[in-house]
A protein has these predicted regions:
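Short S/T/G/P-rich N-terminal loop/turn motif that feeds into the first structured element of a domain
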Residues: 1-51, 57-71, 78-98
Length: 98
């Protein structure tokens, strides 16, 4: 399994808008890609920091997923009021109970 992790610093008062954008944009876009496994959005309501995680069954699916969710991810980042470019990293999941 493979993961894409996006870390964004935004505005605490925009967390709910970011959640809505992630839930209604990023997740459906990711779900449309063969090999999609799961998506998570972690949020710190005090600081406005958000971490989006998508899980994929292969590296190829992760690459296709990046293309599929690019527009929706940009909208979610904008909804959070991010003032900087997010950090995006990719990993192999080496232990999981999913």
């Amino acid at each position: 399994m493979y993961a894409r992790v996006t870390v964004v610093q935004g505005s605490p008062d925009k967390i709910d808008q970011a959640i809505e954008s992630f839930s209604n944009g990023v997740m459906p876009a990711a779900q449309s890609v063969a090999g999609y496994k799961a998506a998570f959005l972690l949020a710190d309501r005090q600081t406005g920091k958000g971490i989006g995680i998508t899980l994929w069954d292969s590296e190829d699916a992760r690459r296709r997923g990046a293309e599929a969710v690019a527009e929706a991810r940009a909208a979610a980042i904008k909804a959070l009021g991010a003032g900087s470019i997010p950090a995006v990293e990719e990993f192999e999941v080496v232990a999981s109970d999913l």
